[in-house]
């Protein structure tokens, strides 16, 4: 089955490329949406933080998740939320933003280690041992369960913060001319110039995707040549 195996490898590669392009396109669309509807995006992220906090409490009560690790995650989302006071503007020099960046990495590492070593009882929540003293059957969380938890409770708010970097031209302090009138000149825009790296990266990615589709004959512009 040489040809069939080659087709399977080709399908895997094409699927990975398609998934990558889809994720990049979704991030670009979300960033444009945040730029046009910043208030709505801020309200959604704040309510998302409250929802995740409630989910963490329910996981501790009903599924036996560790209390201190869940409390740490709730505290992390509280730190994320207090950074929304200047949304969609973020200052890379503020301690609360640097703390939020540290908590994002710490949450990811701690929860990954938790799912690697922790086993859940197959029966409904209860003791690890039954009344006779025999050990209950346990199993680790499935991939879909881990991916869903990490995507909703760990990554969703940080991704929202990441895509909001492109919501304004003066968000990222990359190449700037500081103003002497205000220490918080990152939000003024009239006193300095800012090069928005993420916006340029998204636009270049969109141009690359459009050129790739044109070369494959899948774009409307390529069909106009033969009309």
From Swiss-Prot:
UniProt KW keywords: Golgi apparatus, Membrane, Transmembrane, Transmembrane helix
Q: Key word Transmembrane present in the record?
A: yes
A GO molecular function held by the record? COPII receptor activity
Where in or outside the cell is it found?
Golgi apparatus, cis-Golgi network membrane
From the broadest rank down, the organism's phylogenetic lineage runs: Eukaryota, Fungi, Dikarya, Ascomycota, Taphrinomycotina
Family statement: Belongs to the SVP26 family.
Signal peptide start-end: none
- Name assigned to this protein: Protein svp26
Q: Which gene encodes it?
A: svp26
Q: Which GO terms describe its cellular component?
A: COPII-coated ER to Golgi transport vesicle; cytoplasm; endoplasmic reticulum; endoplasmic reticulum membrane; Golgi membrane
């Amino acid at each position: 089955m040489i040809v069939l195996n080659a087709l399977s490898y080709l399908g895997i590669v094409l699927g990975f490329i398609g998934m990558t392009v889809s994720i990049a396109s979704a991030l670009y669309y979300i960033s444009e949406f945040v730029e046009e509807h910043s208030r709505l995006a801020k309200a959604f992220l704040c309510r998302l933080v409250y929802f995740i906090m409630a989910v963490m409490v329910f996981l501790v009560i009903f599924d036996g998740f560790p209390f201190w690790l869940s409390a740490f995650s709730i505290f992390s989302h509280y730190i994320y939320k207090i950074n929304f006071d200047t949304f969609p503007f973020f200052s890379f020099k503020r301690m609360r933003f640097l703390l939020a960046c540290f908590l994002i990495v710490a949450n990811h590492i701690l929860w990954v280690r938790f799912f690697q070593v922790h086993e859940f009882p197959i029966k409904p929540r209860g003791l690890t041992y039954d009344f006779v003293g025999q050990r209950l059957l346990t199993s680790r969380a499935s991939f879909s369960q881990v991916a869903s938890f990490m995507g909703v409770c760990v990554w969703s708010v940080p991704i929202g913060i990441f895509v909001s970097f492109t919501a304004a031209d003066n968000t990222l302090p990359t190449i700037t001319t500081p103003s002497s009138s205000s220490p918080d000149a990152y939000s003024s825009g009239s006193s300095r110039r800012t090069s928005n790296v993420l916006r340029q990266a998204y636009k270049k990615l969109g141009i690359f995707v459009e050129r790739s589709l044109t070369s494959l004959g899948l774009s409307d512009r390529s069909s106009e040549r033969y009309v």
